UniProtKB/Swiss-Prot annotation:
The keyword Transferase applies. This is Levansucrase Lscbeta. Sucrose hydrolase activity is negatively affected by salt concentration. The levan polymerization rate is constant regardless of sucrose concentration. Catalyzes the synthesis of levan, a fructose polymer, by transferring the fructosyl moiety from sucrose to a growing acceptor molecule. Also displays sucrose hydrolase activity. The active site is at 62 (nucleophile), 303 (proton donor/acceptor). Sucrose binds at residues 61-62, 148, 218-219. Its EC number is 2.4.1.10. Keywords: Carbohydrate metabolism, Glycosyltransferase, Transferase. Belongs to the glycosyl hydrolase 68 family. It comes from Pseudomonas syringae pv. actinidiae. One of its GO terms (molecular function) is levansucrase activity. Strain KL103 contains two functional levansucrases, Lscbeta and Lscgamma. A third copy, lscalpha, is non-coding because of a premature stop codon. Lscbeta and Lscgamma show different sucrose splitting and polymerization properties, and differential expression, suggesting two distinct roles in the physiology of the bacterium. It is an enzyme of class 2 (transferase).
Length: 431
């Protein structure tokens, strides 16, 4: 049985969301053909190869600022807090020494995902981050990998819900509750001891491991809909169906120009932005809903989706890679976005193509895992920056922050700031 985006459009009487009736927005091949990697208004400034490193002992990548459910980035008692996916560097480990006994940082960096742990950092300045350590002690998380999610400050008592991804074996959206304690000297995240798995891919809307061994299901980002006041969550998924069974039909093609009708093996790229709704604001019980955006025949990854609510519009951002595009399409590593007037859509690709902020062609892998904040600031990490010839320098550290301006369906890169500059939008004083 073949699967297409249109197969997901159906009336659903949701026990938690009520009677809903929406069709996923299709990010079409015609949309993606408009991607322009050389547009300066959607291109991140070049990162210098002499960038500073925030730690000599750990790599960091996906960065998750502490925030509230409306997206506001917060500090607590004057301390800004970020969480990062983190892995130890191994400069003295024989496993990562080359034939000449030199540290092979490239191989160490490439292996990081298998040992990813959630760690936290704190700062008085919104930069100059101080390493706090692990969020969860070893053995608390039920799987071998701790992958990205969202830390939510719940109240002025310091309670925090960390939504994250439990990976290997399987992949599940999970939550763990703890608290933040501050002093004049620093910050502690404490009591993150009881992990609750919330849901896994269902095989009806979202592809499972049984349907595709290289499936994607991760990156929870909860939020309160400013219109109906309910708690929802977006996440990365793939459209359900056996690998290779999907159809790239007329909707997925869009109005392509002559010569672009042949899609080759594009049926294998089936990314989507998923949606779930909570029973109540406690976030303890969730129901999976159909995807909001599908990318069948366009791209296989729609990582770390998240919202900004501005001027009565829903700005839905995601990140994706050059290498996950389908055959016949090309785009940079970076931020992609969709905008609409209602949570359930329909959405329009921003800047006509979907591209919001891409790496420059001369440094295609300089940054990744961007997070767009409500103040327009965008944080990311440095992956690799070219140096001499074909060589490059590994990052594993925070990239320079940039600001984008949103105007209707369009976006513009406007300013660049210091490395890892993630200022709070509001300070919460604990009671």
């Amino acid at each position: 049985m073949s699967t297409s985006s249109s197969a997901l459009s159906q009336l659903k009487n949701s026990p938690l969301a009520g009677n809903i009736n929406y069709e996923p927005t299709v990010w079409s091949r015609a949309d993606a053909l408009k991607v322009n990697e050389n547009d300066p208004t959607t291109t991140q400034p070049l990162v210098s190869a002499d960038f500073p490193v925030m730690s000599d002992t750990v790599f960091i990548w996906d960065t998750m600022p502490l925030r509230e459910l409306d997206g506001t980035v917060v500090s607590v008692n004057g301390w800004s807090v970020i969480l990062t996916l983190t892995a130890d560097r191994h400069p003295d480990d024989p496993q990562y020494l080359d034939a000449n006994g030199r540290y092979d940082i490239k191989r160490d960096w490439e292996d990081r995902h298998g040992r990813a742990r959630m760690c936290y950092w704190y700062s008085r300045t919104g930069k100059d981050w101080i390493f706090g350590g692990r969020v969860m002690a070893e053995g608390v998380s039920p799987t071998t990998r701790e992958w990205a999610g969202t830390p939510i400050l719940l109240n002025d008592k310091g309670d925090i819900d960390l939504y994250y991804t439990c990976v290997t074996p399987g992949a599940a959206i999970a939550k763990v509750r703890g608290r933040i304690v501050t002093s004049d000297q620093g910050v502690e995240l404490k009591d993150f001891t009881q992990v609750k798995k919330l849901f896994e891919a269902d095989g009806t809307y979202y592809q499972t491991e049984a349907q595709n061994s290289s499936w994607n299901f991760r990156d929870p980002s909860p939020f309160i809909d400013p219109n109906d006041g309910k708690l929802y969550m977006v996440f990365e998924g793939n459209v359900a169906g056996e690998r290779g069974s999907h159809t790239v039909g007329a909707a997925e093609l869009g109005p392509v120009p002559p010569g672009h009708e042949d899609v080759g093996g594009a049926r294998f790229q089936v990314g989507c932005i998923g949606l779930a709704v909570a029973k109540d604001l406690s976030g303890e019980e969730w129901e999976i809903l159909p995807p909001l955006v599908t990318a069948v025949g366009v791209n296989d990854q729609t990582e770390r989706p998240h919202y900004i609510f501005q001027d009565g519009k829903y700005y839905l951002f995601t990140i994706s890679h050059k290498f996950t595009y389908a055959e016949g399409l090309e785009g940079p590593d970076g931020v992609y976005g969709f905008v609409g007037e209602h949570l359930f859509g329909p959405y329009r690709p921003m800047n006509a193509s979907g591209l919001v902020l891409g790496n420059p062609p001369e440094q295609p892998f300089q940054t990744y895992s961007h997070c767009v904040m409500p103040n327009g600031l965008v944080t990311s990490f440095i992956d690799s920056v070219p140096t001499d010839g074909e060589d490059y320098r590994i990052g594993g550290t925070e990239a320079p922050t940039v600001r984008i301006v949103l105007k209707g369906d369009r976006s513009f890169v406007q300013e660049e700031y210091d490395y890892g500059y993630i200022p709070a939008m509001k300070d919460v004083q604990l009671s």
